[in-house]
Regions:
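Accessory nucleic-acid engagement/destabilization modules that flank
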Residues: 2-205
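Conserved helicase motor
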Residues: 10-15, 275, 296-309, 456-459, ...
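C-terminal helicase lobe and adjacent C-terminal extensions/tails of nucleic-acid helicase motors
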Residues: 96, 381, 439-446, 454, ...
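SF2 helicase catalytic motif II
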Residues: 327, 331-335, 343-383, 388
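Inter-Walker segment of RecA-like/P-loop motor cores
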Residues: 290-339
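Conserved Walker A/P-loop ATP-binding site and its immediately adjacent core
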Residues: 256, 265-289, 301, 397
Length: 727
């Protein structure tokens, strides 16, 4: 009888010519399939044996009468993960056992032997083994013995934590893919071209740039050549320090593709600080490499996924695990995934192994998380065969941290002639004017036909904008929804091109990745990196003389928001004795000062300490860190604005049409506000909240009084309580 006994992993209903039947996936087929895939994925970092065993044993707990009853007769829920974890534990490979235990519920905190039975840690849950809570395995299911060398957990280790998360990623992606193959048949995955093909396309585009005529284009060509020749160097950690306007987007792509092909690497990943930069870079890459080879993955992207009608979007599928030749994503998405514990977020991690990863605008990494960010970069290079390129015009000083987290890799500069290029690309003259009253500032701005003024706070930006004449004046800040900002930017570009008056007052959002070109820029005193980013919007194409392209640095009479305090302090020290703001040496001094002022606060929540020493008596606090590590403090709330097309999307939301795609589209019509501003709007009766609309959570609302959203300046701060809200 035992010979006929069948154990199933999954079932799926099939309708053939109106006749309903059920198809079954054998448990042994599923475990074998997952084992094979997981082995393949883990091979990228030499962990193929562990990958295979994790896959072959992850669903052992389905070989129980209780689980089969659940699957076939809709019986009660059953813990099917602990049994496989227990089997892996027999080889004393406890962290791999934790991967198996968390393959649905997330990688748990490891805990300690003192944890009571049933605690939500690995050690607490494994104690349930042998109690009635965990059904006994059916002796008729042939479970293969675990063949693994011992890997006991004796002490905490940061590198082991990264390795565990990588193995977890291999397991959950393999599990998703094998299950998907059974449930839905073959899906359009891995559809991009080879990196060799992409390199050929890039070469064809670059050949059009041969024989440059202008001085600037000759310099860009030299930088490009330096990138191509450096690509033959070994894998490791590189910096690419190129002045603004030096063509770093294309040059870094040339390095990445040449390097990846040279070393047989799997993909290229771009990590950028803002979604606004992503959209721009992604357009450049798509133009060169073809739309199907470029995956954008961030909160603002929408996929056309028509899976109900059997037409899954290959890009939506690729976004689940980054199985694409070129991925472009945000620093938030990237680093939060590196410290995540949920299967959906960790799925993609194994595809970072053996990849070229470009960190664009590397100076934008938040200082309070600098250490865990560099630790993640170090681990990818040191343990997982990746190459990292820190790419910026203002290189932060990271040597000491790189040495700590990637001790066998020294940083190497791709384009070593740094001072020479910075001199050649000098397109502006800096002028420091001290304190300016807002009225005096407005007068100065009015004296220019075309000028950009960047202010630290959203409130001050609105106030200064209100002092300018209506004709030809524009305002940009994050109090305007993204779709609105895009419309205004198009108007600004048109007026600049047509030589019409165009005065813009903006917050710092224009500093990175917005390619507008002004003859004059005013920048309120801020971090030196911000000032240089602002300067990059002045005489961008070098069509005017540097001495006629003035970047004016000023202070306002009102104190800057506290957020800017340390950066301004470091800038004051770095610019002492009339130092040249644009020289790489001044920049280095600035980052040294900033690190000094910040002291030990470069790991705000103690991520490194938690994995090197344990936390709260628990070794390997995967879940605790995942829940607490946020690149951007979410002390803001979302207000959806019924502006233009946003109104129809909000109607759909209120009618209950909730879907991922709808929330993504709504992101284009949302403003983030601080709690006090949210409360003031609520008190003024201007918000519809979760109490009235099920589709909202307690951190979001809909603006129902459109008189508070201005066509020029966005969401009004009039309802506020006098506090500075800054963006």
């Amino acid at each position: 009888i035992a010979m006929d006994k069948k154990f199933y992993a999954h079932t799926r209903p099939i309708n053939e010519n109106g006749v309903e039947r059920t198809e079954y996936q054998l448990l042994s087929d599923h475990e074998h399939g997952v084992g094979t895939l997981c082995r393949q994925f883990a091979e990228a970092f030499g962990a193929q044996a562990e990958g295979h065993e994790a896959g072959v044993h992850h669903d052992d707990g389905k070989a129980t009468a209780a689980f089969q009853h659940r699957l076939l007769d809709n019986g009660p829920k059953v813990d099917h993960a602990t049994a496989g974890a227990q089997n892996i534990m027999l080889s004393n490979n406890l962290l791999l056992a934790a991967c198996v235990m968390g393959h649905h519920s997330g990688l748990p905190d490891f805990g300690s032997t003192k944890d009571p039975l049933g605690a939500p840690t690995f050690t607490g849950r494994i104690k349930k083994w042998g109690t009635p809570a965990i059904p006994l395995l059916d002796p008729d299911y042939p479970i293969p013995p675990v063949r693994l060398p011992q890997r006991p957990v004796t002490k905490p280790s940061l590198s082991e934590s990264f390795r565990t998360r990588m193995l977890y990623s291999c397991l959950v992606d393999a599990d998703y893919l094998d299950t998907e193959r059974f449930m839905k048949g073959d899906m359009p995955r891995g559809t991009g071209d080879s990196l060799e093909t992409l390199l050929t396309r890039l070469q064809a585009r670059l050949n059009e740039w041969d024989n440059p005529t202008s001085e600037l284009n000759k310099l860009r060509q030299q930088i490009l050549r330096a990138c191509v020749s450096a690509a033959a160097n070994p894998k490791g950690i590189y910096t690419l320090t190129v002045p603004t306007g030096g063509g770093k987007t294309t040059s870094s792509l040339a390095f990445a593709l040449h390097h990846a092909v040279e070393h047989g690497m799997k993909r290229v990943i771009y990590v950028v600080p803002y979604t606004s930069i992503i959209e721009q870079n992604a357009d450049v890459f798509r133009g060169i490499l073809g739309n199907e080879n470029v995956l954008e993955h961030h909160s603002g992207v929408q996929f056309e996924n028509d899976e109900e009608n059997g037409n899954p979007d290959p890009k939506a599928l690729a976004a689940e695990n980054w199985d694409s030749p070129l991925v472009i994503t945000t620093a938030v998405q990237f680093f939060e995934s590196m410290y995540a514990n949920r299967s959906s977020q960790c799925r993609k991690l194994h595809n970072l192994a053996n990849s070229v990863i470009i960190f664009d605008e590397a100076q934008m990494l938040p200082l309070c998380h600098l250490m865990p960010c560099v630790a993640a970069i170090g681990a990818l290079v040191e343990q997982f065969g990746a190459t990292a390129v820190l790419c910026t015009a203002t290189q932060p000083v990271l040597g000491d941290l790189i040495q700590r987290f990637a001790p066998s890799h020294a940083i190497s500069e791709i384009c070593p002639e740094i001072p020479f290029y910075f001199d050649k690309f000098r397109r502006v003259t800096f002028r420091q004017v001290g304190v300016l009253e807002d009225d005096a500032l407005a007068e100065l701005l009015c004296a220019h036909e075309q000028v950009l003024c960047i202010i630290n706070s959203r409130k001050a930006a609105q106030s200064i904008f209100s002092k300018l004449p209506e004709e030809g004046s524009f305002h940009l800040s994050t109090l305007m929804v993204p779709a609105h900002r895009r419309t205004v930017l198009e108007q600004i570009r048109r007026r600049l091109n047509d030589g019409l008056p165009c005065r813009v007052v903006s917050t710092s959002l224009v500093e990175a990745g917005v390619d507008i070109d002004y003859p004059a820029v005013y920048r309120e005193l801020a971090g030196l990196d911000s000032i240089l980013q602002a300067a990059g919007r002045c005489n961008r194409e070098g069509k005017r003389a540097a001495e006629d392209s003035i970047v004016t640095i000023f202070r306002r009479t009102e104190k800057a928001p506290p957020l800017f305090g340390q950066a301004i302090g470091a800038t004051n020290i770095a610019l002492d004795n009339n130092a040249d703001p644009a020289s790489p040496q001044t920049m280095e001094n600035y980052f040294h000062e900033l690190r000094k002022l910040n002291g030990s606060a470069i790991d705000k929540i103690g991520v490194i300490d938690a994995f090197e020493r344990g936390r709260g008596g628990s070794l390997y606090p995967f879940r605790t860190i995942a829940e607490n590590f946020r690149m951007i403090d979410n002390d803001t709330r979302t207000v959806y604005i019924p502006w233009r097309e946003g109104a129809e999307l909000i109607d759909r939301l209120c009618a209950g049409a909730c879907s991922k795609s709808l929330y993504r589209q709504l992101g284009q019509y949302a403003v983030q506000v601080y709690d006090a501003h949210f409360q003031a709007l609520y008190d003024a009766g201007a918000l519809q909240t979760a109490d009235e609309t099920n589709a909202l959570d307690d951190r979001s609302a809909i603006l129902c009084d459109l008189s508070l959203y201005d066509e020029k300046t966005g969401l009004s701060l009039k309802a506020d309580s006098g506090q500075a809200f800054f963006g």
